[in-house]
Structures are given as structure tokens and as C-alpha cells.
Amino acid sequence: MPGNPQLQESRMSHKETGMRLSRRSMLKTILYTPPILMFGKGGLFADGEVKPLYEPRRIDPNQKVRTAVIGVFNRGAQVIGEFRRFGRQIEFAAFADVAFLEPNASLRGFEGVPCFRDYREMFERMHEQIDAVIIATPDHAHFPMVVHSMLLGKHVYVEKPLAQNVYECRLLQKMAKWCPDVIVQMGNQGHSGEGTLQFREWVKAGLIKNVRKIDAWMTNSRRWHGWTDTSYPEAIPPIGFDWDIWLMRRPFRPYSEKLVDGNWRCWYEFGCGAMGDWGAHILDAIHRYYLNSALPDEITTKLIGPSDLIYPQGSVITFKFKARDGRPAVELNWYDGQGNNPPAPPGVEGNLGNVGSLVYCEDFVVRGTSHGGLYRLLSGEKTKELRDAGKLPETPRPPSNHYQNFLNACQGIEPVNSPIEVAAPLAELLCLGCVGQRFGGT
């Protein structure tokens, strides 16, 4: 970048850099440079292919994966609990969270594990003792943290969505090619579930075919329903809470309780709304195995209670996919907002529930849930007919759940189930939906 001689001097391969900068200097340059500046014109990696500063450590099955966690409260605490079940495979090496209010904080139950407010300081001081990173932060922080982790050769488990906009999703796909030995798993945990494998087998068997319409919905109440904010609220942060790190170089907004503790999902600038939160759990099998991770050719939106700052009170987003791969054109409709369910299929009475999907196949309709739950045909008669004819494939049992799958992949036992190659196109679909919710129209 003009005016930054360190960055200008650093625009070179790591081998060349070693002549001018120590590896430690390079480490600091990577950590304290926003990724968008690293890859932009004049940036650290503007000239093409990137290699990690450190190669990922080879971890044998009899060795534990030394894991740091960024974002340890709220969802982070739940994820820690899930990984802790596999104590024979994981060792928690460090924790980082802007909400560690005391300089020498510790996490209950993990006394002795170093804690940091700033994840960059954690990497700077402990990168040699870390093999993998769990990222359970607000959506806007996922991308820079994933990039920094990958450039340091650390395997990554990152909560969904993988990133918050289309540019970030596409750059991470490049990163996956540049850093092929770095394992990344997006945390749509149902992608390792039984229902996902079942849907895959139904597609392979030709059971799900000639689909022309898919409806998906999440119509539970959300945090922002009923909000009427037309400006960012303002309050004083708790003493010790590092608001600057939380913002992650986004334009300054004042601290408010309406931005933290999960409320960030409500705001365009920091979250991805209901679609980013639940779409990854409802659409993952459909997008991966029927739509073949394709992106839509056209998007239209109908909004209920639109806002300039927060997600609408409800929406219907229609993604149109052209005919491809020998399959007809498909219309995927996403519904959110209280009571904003799709119409029920012909002959179906009663409430569809607040979460689910309907896949309109050639001869029947398939009902899905979320988080890797099992699919079923709405017609019991058709189900019996297919089962009696031996045309209803058996559902494979997953060899591991999503969390252990990540640890297994780090140890070379099995491939990861939701790598960037799968997760980024899904995240991009969700981000495109969020763009539609923000701006409306087609």
C-alpha cells in the first residue's frame, strides 16, 4: 500500500521475504493487516498465489490436536462443550475473547489455559503451540480470522456462515487452493448428520429427480422482530471490553447491548439474519447434493417491514436456477418472518411447523427438517410402494459427528465433510439472499 513501506517491502514470496524480514516480523505483518488490504492492489499478497507462513503440523491419530478457541462465550461455550466430548483427541491450548474483562482471566473448568482478549496477540505469543483454531464469533469476524489462521498454517473450524459477503466467500475458495494442507470445516453440524447422507443416497438412486420447486422456511420469532431502529443505539462498554477488536476494523459504531451477545445477527453490518443463521442447516443437503453447489441465475425478494439497518420483519426470497446437469430449471423459495410459511402442498392439511423444507419431485413431495434431520415422503402410500419395491435406499450411518469429523481430519483419519469447496458456495448463496433482503427487488 502507498505510504506503508513495510507492506510494500513484504509483497513477495515467503522465501524472498525471509531475506528482508524475519519470520516473526512477517507474522506480525500478517496478523495486523486486514485481509482486504493483503489481497487488494498494492497489498501483501497482491501478486498471486499465497503460501502459509508455517506448514500445518502433521498430527498422528495418537496425538492430540492442540486447539485454540476464538469466541468462548454464548455459542462458543456450546461448541467447546461439543469438542470436549472428544478429550482423547483434543487439547485446549488457548482461549481468546474480547469479553475477558480482567488481564489475567481464566475460563471456568480450564484453569491454566492461557486467555487473551486479542486473538492476534494469542497467535503472536503461542502460534507454535497451536495446531487448530475454533472460531465462534459474530459473522463479520469470521473471514479475517479464518484468513489469519490459514496463513499461519492452522486448521480451522468456523461457525456458519463461512463468511459475510460474496467477495469473502470467493477469496476463501482461492485460499483453499493456495493452502491445500490446511483443513477448514464450516460449522453447519447437520452436514455430518444422518439426514444429509440419506438425501445424498436418495439423489444417487434417482428417487429425487426432476425437481422444479423447493420451499424452505424458518418462521420462528427472531431477536429483531418488533425492532424499529433507524440509527445505531449507543451505550458505554463494560470496563475491559475491547470494542475496537470486536468491530474488527468495520466502520466505527457505538457499543450497545443490541449489538452483542447474539444481537449482532440482527444487523446487516455484522450478521446474516435468519437466512445466514438457519439456511446453512436447512438448505445444506439440498444445495450440495441436488443443486450441486450451484449459484442462482436470478434472485427476487418480497420484504415485510424492510429497514436500512436491520433485517426485515419477514421476507420471501426466490432463487432461480437454470436447467443444468441434465436437470430442469429449479425455483428455490426461502421464507422467514413470524407466520410467513409457504403454502402447503396439495392434499396436505395442518401446520407445516416453523422450520423445514419441501422438495417437489416428479411424483411426490419430500419433507425435510434441519440440522441433518431425516427426510420423509409426505405420501405414506408412496413410501410403502417404494419400500416394497426395494427402491427406498438404506440410510448410511455417519462414522462421526461434525465435531469429531474435524478432529479426525486433522489427524488424517477421514476427510472433512464441510470444507471450503462445499461451504463457500453455500455461504455465497446465503449472502446473496441477505443482499436481496437489504436492497429488495430483483
Where are these regions (language model features)?
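N-terminal secretory signal peptides and thylakoid transit peptides that target proteins
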Residues: 13-34
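N-terminal Rossmann-like dinucleotide-binding module
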Residues: 33-110, 286
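Predominantly a Rossmann-like dinucleotide-binding segment in NAD(P)-dependent oxidoreductases
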Residues: 71, 75-76, 178-185, 190-300, ...
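Conserved acidic residues
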Residues: 93, 131, 212
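Beta-strand-loop-alpha-helix segment that lines the small-molecule cofactor/substrate pocket
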Residues: 138-139, 143-191, 206
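C-terminal helical cap and adjacent loop that interface with cofactors, partners, or active-site loops
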Residues: 30-39, 52, 78, 254-259, ...
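A structured beta-alpha segment of the ubiquitous adenosine-cofactor-binding alpha/beta core
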Residues: 114-130, 135
